[in-house]
């Protein structure tokens, strides 16, 4: 950790990463029960942000994208400052957070242009996160002088998450097509690995901030 970057500030950025996945998940669950006719089983999470479908309720999901995206960007900044050699990891994660934020700017409306922009942003975000997880595995797969062996488990964990993410993308492409009776379920399962990865990495940074 940089001597110029205090533990309290690093802790704040780490907490942003801890909060982001939990906040996003809880908001989606609550919104799904608030919106009449919405199904977690058959519908995507982004459907909740469509104003043409759910009116003012859609604002909740788009605010969810905004807040979660900002929290992820702040966590990425803390990761960059707190862990030497994590530039690519943090930059890719920050890009993912920015794409997450943009999902709220371009809701998944049931008309061609906004929907196309929404899905393009989603794919860019997904690829950037894959890059972040890949380089996390590379960065932490063997001990670095001065860091001990504690971060090796994060490298192994990142490799597991990387494999799960690739498998999830394939499963989503096959079983998450429009009209699928389990489209919503498949999306939620496929997004679980990256949310867990962010949570675990943030907890690791939080632990580092207390050293």
Where are these regions (language model features)?
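Interfacial helix-start motif at the membrane-water boundary
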Residues: 48-70
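Interfacial segments of alpha-helical transmembrane regions
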Residues: 9-19, 83-94, 148-160
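Terminal transmembrane helical module of multi-pass membrane proteins
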Residues: 138-211
